[in-house]
Curated annotation (Swiss-Prot):
Annotated positions for site Lowers pKa of C-terminal Cys of second active site: 256
Phosphoserine modified-residue sites: 129, 156, 158, 428
Highest rank taxon of the organism: Eukaryota
UniProt-recorded Gene Ontology molecular function terms: protein disulfide isomerase activity; protein-disulfide reductase activity
Keywords of the record: Cell membrane, Chaperone, Disulfide bond, Endoplasmic reticulum, Isomerase, Membrane, Phosphoprotein, Redox-active center, Repeat, Signal
Signal peptide region: 1-19
Effect annotated for changing residue 193 to A: Accelerates dephosphorylation of ERN1
Annotated S-S bridges: 55-58, 190-193
Positions of the Thioredoxin domain: 20-133, 154-287
Database matches in Pfam families: Thioredox_PDIA6_C (PF24541), Thioredoxin (PF00085)
Protein name: Protein disulfide-isomerase A6
Length: 440
C-alpha cells in the first residue's frame, strides 16, 4: 500500500514541484492574477484543468491535454491552474480532487464539470459540443461574455438562492440550524448594498451548489427588522456576519466580490466538513485510489485481532479517526490494515521490526516513505504528522521502488477473533497392542 506525502529530495519530505506545463505549450497557465481577465471577462469558450503536480492522474492527462490544446488553438481556449499552488482558485470553484476539468461557456459564473474521457480526442469532442451550445445561446440572446453583475435582483438565476430573513424567521432558520450562515444586513437605500447585491446573489447560487446547501447566504433588511439590527449591533451597511452552531457570530471582513465571498464560504465549509474516511485496505483499488487522489496517505498497521480483541482494535481506530479529523484540512487519505494481512506492503515499508501497531507515510510519486518511530498514541502520531507537514523527518525509498502488491481480503466484521477449531482425530481404529509390538 502506499501513502502519499509531498516529498523531498534532499532533507525535506515535502518538495515544491514545478507545474506540468510551460510557456512553449498551447495550454495557457492561469493564476489568481490573470484568471478573471483571461477567463471570466472573455467572450471565448474555456476548458480549464485544475491540477496538482504530484497527482499521478494529472501527469497522465498532461500529454492529452496538450494535444487537445494544440488541436483547439484559435478555436477554444485551453487552460490549466496549479490548484496545489493556487488554493484560492481551486477553493473558489469547489475543487476537491485532481484533475478537475471545468467548462466556462455562456455563463462564466456557472462553469460546468467535464465528465468525459481523458484522451485528446474526447476532450476535443466535448469542447466542440460546448462551442456549439455557446453559439446557440448567443443566437437565443444569451450573453457568452463577462457579466459585471450590475443587474441587481433581476438576475433570476441567483436571486432565488439568497434567503430573506426577518425578526420572526431568523432564530428558527439560523440559530437552530446545523449549517453555516453568512448573513448580510442591508438598507434598501444604501449604495454599497446595491453594489453588493448582485455579487451576493451570484455567490449564493455557487455556494449552495458547491457545499450542497451546508453553507447558506441570507439577507436581512435592517431598516424593517430592527429587533435583529439592535441585537447584533448593526451600525453601518452592509454588515455581514457569520453564524455557526454553538459559536458567537463573527464579522465577515473579506472582499465584496463573488469570488471573495465564495472563497470564504468554502473555507467555512472545510472547517465544518466531516473528517475523511478511515478505510480498511481490502483490495488494491482502495489502496491505490486513496493514495493517488490525496496529497498524503497515512497507513496504520494494527495488531492481529487475536492480540487485541474488538475493544482494543476499536480504541486504535478511535485515535486514528480523531487525528484524521484534526488534519482534515490537509485533505489526506487514511488507511489501515491488520498485521500480516498485507505482507508485501509491510516489507516495502520496513514495518514490523518495531512491533505492532505501526504507521508510515509515503510519497507515492517519488516512492519514498517516512516511518513512525515514536509511540503509537495520539500524542506520538500527532508529533509525527506535524513534523511531516512542516517538511521535516527522515525518509527512505519504498522497497522494490514500486507500489506494493495488495492482497484482496474480507473486511473486518467488527467482532473478536476466534482461534481456528482443530479437527478431532478418530482413534477408534488404532490397534494399541500392535503399536506396542512395533515399537519393541
Amino acid at each position: 500500500m502506499a501513502l502519499l506525502v509531498l516529498g523531498l529530495v534532499s532533507c525535506t519530505f515535502f518538495l515544491a514541484v514545478n507545474g506540468l506545463y510551460s510557456s512553449s505549450d498551447d495550454v495557457i497557465e492561469l493564476t489568481p492574477s490573470n484568471f478573471n481577465r483571461e477567463v471570466i471577462q472573455s467572450d471565448s469558450l474555456w476548458l480549464v484543468e485544475f491540477y496538482a503536480p504530484w497527482c499521478g492522474h494529472c501527469q497522465r492527462l498532461t500529454p492529452e491535454w496538450k494535444k487537445a490544446a494544440t488541436a483547439l488553438k484559435d478555436v477554444v481556449k485551453v487552460g490549466a491552474v496549479d490548484a496545489d499552488k493556487h488554493h484560492s482558485l481551486g477553493g473558489q470553484y469547489g475543487v476537491q480532487g485532481f484533475p478537475t476539468i471545468k467548462i466556462f461557456g455562456s455563463n462564466k459564473n456557472r462553469p460546468e464539470d467535464y465528465q468525459g474521457g481523458r484522451t485528446g480526442e474526447a476532450i476535443v469532442d466535448a469542447a466542440l459540443s460546448a462551442l456549439r451550445q455557446l453559439v446557440k445561446d448567443r443566437l437565443g440572446g444569451r450573453s457568452g461574455g463577462y457579466s459585471s453583475g450590475k443587474q441587481g435582483r433581476s438576475d433570476s438565476s441567483s436571486k432565488k438562492d439568497v434567503i430573506e430573513l426577518t425578526d420572526d424567521s431568523f432564530d428558527k432558520n439560523v440559530l437552530d440550524s446545523e449549517d453555516v450562515w453568512m448573513v448580510e444586513f442591508y438598507a434598501p437605500w444604501c449604495g454599497h448594498c446595491k453594489n453588493l447585491e448582485p455579487e451576493w446573489a451570484a455567490a449564493a447560487s455557487e455556494v449552495k451548489e458547491q457545499t450542497k446547501g451546508k453553507v447558506k447566504l441570507a439577507a436581512v433588511d435592517a431598516t424593517v427588522n430592527q429587533v435583529l439590527a439592535s441585537r447584533y449591533g448593526i451600525r453601518g451597511f452592509p454588515t455581514i456576519k457569520i453564524f455557526q452552531k454553538g459559536e458567537s457570530p463573527v464579522d465577515y471582513d473579506g472582499g465584496r466580490t463573488r469570488s471573495d465571498i465564495v472563497s470564504r464560504a468554502l473555507d467555512l465549509f472545510s472547517d465544518n466538513a466531516p473528517p475523511p474516511e478511515l478505510l480498511e485496505i481490502i483490495n488494491e483499488d482502495i489502496a491505490k485510489r486513496t493514495c493517488e487522489e490525496h496529497q498524503l496517505c497515512v497507513v496504520a498497521v494494527l495488531p492481529h485481532i487475536l492480540d487485541t480483541g474488538a475493544a482494543g482494535r476499536n480504541s486504535y481506530l478511535e485515535v486514528l479517526l480523531k487525528l484524521a479529523d484534526k488534519y482534515k484540512k490537509k485533505m489526506w487519505g487514511w488507511l489501515w490494515t491488520e498485521a500480516g494481512a498485507q505482507s508485501e506492503l509491510e516489507t516495502a515499508l520496513g514495518i514490523g521490526g518495531f512491533g505492532y501497531p505501526a504507521m508510515a507515510a509515503i510519497n507515492a510519486r517519488k516512492m519514498k516513505f517516512a516511518l513512525l518511530k515514536g509511540s503509537f498514541s495520539e500524542q506520538g502520531i500527532n508529533e509525527f504528522l506535524r513534523e511531516l507537514s512542516f517538511g521535516r523527518g527522515s525518509t527512505a525509498p519504498v522497497g522494490g521502488g514500486a507500489f506494493p502488491t495488495i492482497v484482496e481480503r474480507e473486511p473486518w466484521d467488527g467482532r473478536d477473533g476466534e482461534l481456528p477449531v482443530e479437527d478431532d482425530i478418530d482413534l477408534s481404529d488404532v490397534e494399541l497392542d500392535d503399536l506396542g509390538k512395533d515399537e519393541l
